[in-house]
Curated annotation (Swiss-Prot):
Keywords: DNA-directed RNA polymerase, Nucleotidyltransferase, Transcription, Transferase
Domain remarks: The N-terminal domain is essential for RNAP assembly and basal transcription, whereas the C-terminal domain is involved in interaction with transcriptional regulators and with upstream promoter elements.
Catalytic activity: RNA(n) + a ribonucleoside 5'-triphosphate = RNA(n+1) + diphosphate
GO (cellular component) term, any one: cytoplasm
Taxonomic classification: Bacteria, Pseudomonadati, Thermodesulfobacteriota, Desulfuromonadia, Desulfuromonadales
Pfam families: RNA_pol_A_bac, RNA_pol_A_CTD, RNA_pol_L
GO MF term set: DNA binding; DNA-directed RNA polymerase activity; protein dimerization activity
Region (Alpha N-terminal domain (alpha-NTD)) location: 1-233
Gene name of the encoded protein: rpoA
Protein name: DNA-directed RNA polymerase subunit alpha
Free-text function comment from the UniProt entry: DNA-dependent RNA polymerase catalyzes the transcription of DNA into RNA using the four ribonucleoside triphosphates as substrates.
Start and end residues of each stretch annotated as Alpha C-terminal domain (alpha-CTD): 250-338
Secretion signal span: none
């Protein structure tokens, strides 16, 4: 049973295209995978990203003087059906899991956009230029809406609340913060063998969830869903592998201080403020994580990537059992002998 999963090659790094990374778009590359695993994991991540991440959406609206969605509002160009359709396009970010109430109040002529929505500190409007309705000079508008958290698509009937005030109209809600996911699989090289997979994943969100966070959430969901199928304990088997000279050098580099990288003062201070002390700590951070570090920019990122590449290392590496207490002890004893 040991060989069933232990001998499969595992991806060693997750790379992020730092130049294109934003609050709404991210491109991620992972390698190497056994042949076929790129498609298996890419398709699984795509489906989870599109269907299972939680987001915020308007679930109902109540309009002053309107009892049902087939009404017209005096002084307003759009009918209620068009207004509801426009409300579905409002992008929101909800801080917390509780539903919140938001409003629009307007008298007289003018164009109402998402920027006119009155919110509290728990709700952010992500597309303030989004058109909602057009008022004439005689218009007197009051819209009361409910924002809630959910996942996937929920039809209006399921958003109906029997305790809601008279005139409340439930709305179809698309909660998913992920708008589009593409993945491609190309060849990856391990030594002289190219019969492995490289997974390239592109994620587009509405801005309420960062693409890198979305990928992390999706991976965690998959992990938790699959955990129930692991109904056996791993057998303990000691495998002694001869460590190559190259692997030994890389291993030693991981335990060196980041101060030995001779970085610029700005980059060194950023690592210090982020409590990154060993090179092994550094390589386990992704490019996206590094860019979130205060005062850490793309110039510092490129500097670090170039230096790590010279050592055969990169950001986004996955290290098992790091740091190893025994290895640290051995290094410390070696320094004391000197």
């Amino acid at each position: 049973m040991y060989k069933n999963w232990r001998e499969l090659i595992k991806p060693k790094r997750l790379q992020v295209d730092a130049d294109s990374l934003s609050d709404t778009y991210g491109k991620f590359m992972a390698e190497p995978f056994e042949r076929g695993f790129g498609t298996t994991l890419g398709n699984s991540l795509r489906r989870v990203l599109l269907s299972s991440l939680q987001g915020a959406a308007i679930t109902s609206v109540r309009i002053k003087g309107v009892l049902h969605e087939f009404s017209n509002i005096p002084g307003v160009t759009e009918d209620v059906t068009d207004i509801i359709l426009n409300l579905k396009g409002v992008l929101l970010k909800l801080h917390g899991s509780d539903s919140r109430n938001i409003r629009i109040v307007k008298k007289g002529a003018g164009v109402i956009t998402a920027a006119d929505i009155i919110t509290d500190s728990h709700v952010d409007v992500l597309n303030p230029d989004h058109h909602i309705l057009t008022c004439g000079k005689d218009a007197d508008i009051e819209l009361d809406m409910v924002v809630a958290m959910g996942k996937g698509y929920v039809p209006a009937e399921r958003n109906r609340d029997d305790k809601a005030p008279v005139g409340t109209i439930p709305i179809d809600s698309l909660f998913s913060p992920v708008k589009k996911v593409n993945f491609t699989v190309t060849n990856a090289r391990v030594g002289q063998i190219t019969d492995y997979d490289k997974l390239i994943l592109e994620v587009l969100t509405d801005g309420s969830v960062r693409p890198d966070d979305g990928v992390a959430y999706a991976a965690k969901i998959l992990k938790e869903q699959l955990q129930i199928f692991i109904n056996f304990d791993e057998e303990t088997e000691t495998v002694v592998e001869e460590e190559s000279e190259e692997s030994r050098k890389i291993n030693e580099n991981l335990y060196r201080s980041v101060e030995e990288l001779e970085l610029s003062v700005r980059s060194a201070n950023c690592l210090k403020n982020a409590n990154i002390h060993l090179i092994g700590d550094l390589v386990q951070r992704s490019e996206a994580e590094m860019l979130k570090t205060q005062n850490f920019g793309r110039k510092s990122l490129n500097e670090i990537k170039d230096i790590l590449a010279e050592m055969g290392l990169s950001l986004g590496m996955m290290l098992e059992n790091f740091p190893d207490p025994e290895y640290l002890k051995m290094i410390q004893e070696g320094k004391e002998d000197l």
